[in-house]
């Protein structure tokens, strides 16, 4: 239960108070959000609609794309509305909800990236047993484990709810997150800050290193492969490792340190909450011929149906 709390809403300071800069940022973040949602949902629909994309790798990619779209939706709409309407306030309950959902999808993505690395290891290092090991039941179980991991990680954020907030209520950020909220609490948050480092920073650091090692092991096993298979495996691994670096490096910068609010934090947060999720569909499709062909077929069918429907209406 919250005690000594007279704060009912927070003010998200955002990036700039200059109207011209806000308009430019509004256009930029709106376009980025639209590209993110359309790109990720296109991958989800494409994988569901294409029988050729029925392997476990594409199942996990569809799940990752859905999480990316949901993750971005947790942050971007509020940011965009604030820039357009100059409404920068968020209720206390809304702030806590954003914090929880943000970390839920972020935690789920971290564990899902681990699952995807394991999937690639089995596919490349044990190809004859791949479909036996990564059967449908195992895939769903791994997905559930990733989601539970995200929930457990986000459940820790509830500790902020019980902290007293007496004022000021200005968050020097564009969204609700642990570090800026802990700085506003009217109590000593040193030990809570240390648990944030463990719950977010240390986990990101450990998993990031494990993922890099796993991709290194996979790459070292490609020596015995033919040039064609080696090229395909390298393409898949390079896509996965690129997303891992783009997502984890900013997270580590933010969370592997005591509670403090650096000017660069907002821009680093934009990178791993918005930019990475926009780039993810491009990274996974540009070097994957199967994905490109499936998307071309899907868009070709939709375009044909649209043209036929339009002609029918005109006739």
Curated annotation (Swiss-Prot):
Disulfide bonds: 95-186
Pfam families referenced in this protein's UniProt entry, alphabetically: 7tm_4 (PF13853)
PROSITE patterns in UniProt: G_PROTEIN_RECEP_F1_1, G_PROTEIN_RECEP_F1_2
Keyword Cell membrane in annotation: yes
GO molecular function, one term: olfactory receptor activity
Subcellular location: Cell membrane
Signal peptide stretch: none
Domain of life per record: Eukaryota
Residues bearing carbohydrate: 6
InterPro entries: GPCR_Rhodpsn (IPR000276), GPCR_Rhodpsn_7TM (IPR017452), Olfact_rcpt (IPR000725), Olfactory_Receptors (IPR050427)
Residues in the Cytoplasmic compartment per record: 48-55, 119-137, 217-232, 287-315
Transmembrane residue ranges: 24-47, 56-77, 99-118, 138-156, 193-216, 233-255, 267-286
Main location class: membrane
Keyword set, alphabetical order: Cell membrane, Disulfide bond, G-protein coupled receptor, Glycoprotein, Membrane, Olfaction, Receptor, Sensory transduction, Transducer, Transmembrane, Transmembrane helix
Extracellular domain ranges by topology: 1-23, 78-98, 157-192, 256-266
CC per GO annotation: plasma membrane
Function per UniProt: Odorant receptor.
PANTHER family per the UniProt record, alphabetical: OLFACTORY RECEPTOR
Family affiliation: Belongs to the G-protein coupled receptor 1 family.
Protein name: Olfactory receptor 4A5
Source organism: Homo sapiens (Human)
Lineage: Eukaryota, Metazoa, Chordata, Craniata, Vertebrata
């Amino acid at each position: 239960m919250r005690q000594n709390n007279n704060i009912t809403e927070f003010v998200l300071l955002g990036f700039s108070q200059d109207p011209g800069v806000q308009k430019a940022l509004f256009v930029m973040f709106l376009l980025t959000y639209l590209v993110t949602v359309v790109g990720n949902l296109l991958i989800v629909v494409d994988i569901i609609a294409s029988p050729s994309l029925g392997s476990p790798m594409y199942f996990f990619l569809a799940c990752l794309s859905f999480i990316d779209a949901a993750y971005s939706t947790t942050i971007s709409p509020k940011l965009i509305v604030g820039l357009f309407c100059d409404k920068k306030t968020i209720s206390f309950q809304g702030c806590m909800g954003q914090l929880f959902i943000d970390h839920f999808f972020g935690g789920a993505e971290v564990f899902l990236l681990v699952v995807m690395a394991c999937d690639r290891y089995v596919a490349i290092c044990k190809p004859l047993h791949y479909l036996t090991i990564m059967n449908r039941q195992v895939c769903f179980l791994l997905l559930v484990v990733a989601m539970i991991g995200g929930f457990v990680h986000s459940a820790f954020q509830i500790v902020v709810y019980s902290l007293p907030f007496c004022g000021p209520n200005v968050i020097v950020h564009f969204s609700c997150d642990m570090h800026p909220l802990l700085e506003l609490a009217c109590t000593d948050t040193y030990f809570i800050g240390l648990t944030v480092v463990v719950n977010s920073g240390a986990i990101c650091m450990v998993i990031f290193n494990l993922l890099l090692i796993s991709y290194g092991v996979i790459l070292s096993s490609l020596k015995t492969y033919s040039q064609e298979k080696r090229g395909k495996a390298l393409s898949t691994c390079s896509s996965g490792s690129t997303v891992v670096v783009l997502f984890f490096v900013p997270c580590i910068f933010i969370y592997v340190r005591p509670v403090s609010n650096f000017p660069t934090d907002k821009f680093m947060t934009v990178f791993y909450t918005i930019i990475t999720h926009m780039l993810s569909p491009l990274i996974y499709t540009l070097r994957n011929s199967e994905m490109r062909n499936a998307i071309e077929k899907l868009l070709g069918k939709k375009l044909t149906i649209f043209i036929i429907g339009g002609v029918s209406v005109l006739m």
